[in-house]
Amino acid sequence: ERLDIKQQVFEKLEKYRTPGTLITSNTSGIPIKFMNEGRSEDFQKHFCGTHFFNPARYLKLFEIIPGPKTDASVLEFLSGYGEQFLGKTSVIAKDTPAFIGNRIGIFSIQSLFHAVKDLDLTIEEVDKLSGPVIGRPKSATFRTVDVVGLDTLVHVANGIAENCPKDERKEL
C-alpha cells in the first residue's frame, strides 16, 4: 500500500510492455488516478485497479476500479475473467476513497472499536458477534484485521480521512 513503490514499478513496466497490454494493481484504497499519473495514454487506457477481499480464497467479491481513462473493454475483460476463471463476483467500483467494500468495512471496524472500548468486550466476543451471526465471513472483525494487516487497516483509514475532509464521521 505504498503509492511511491507502485509508481516506480509502473515506470519500469512501461518501458517493456507492448502497447495494449493490460496492467492492474491490487490495492485496498490507493486512488487509481494517482497510480497511473505520468504514464502514457496507452498505459492509462489499459490500466485499472483491483481489490480482492481477504481471505481471498474464501471471499468471492472482486472490485475492479477503472482510472479516468480506462477503456471499457478492459473492465469487461476483467469482469468476465474474475467470474469465469477466478470464481469471483466482479463489481465495477468508482475511484472513490477505499472504493466500495473497504469504505463500508473500515467505517464498520472503526465504529466497532469504539463499542469494544465502551462495552469492555473481548476479542473473542467481538468476533463471535461480528461474523456469520450477522451475515459476515467467519473471519469476523479481529481475525480479518489480522489477515489483512493492522498496517493496511491504518493506511486505508488514514487515506479515507485524508481524502474525505468533510466527512461528518471522520473522527472515528
Predicted regions mapped to residue ranges:
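N-terminal glycine-rich phosphate-binding loop for ADP-containing cofactors
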Residues: E1-L172
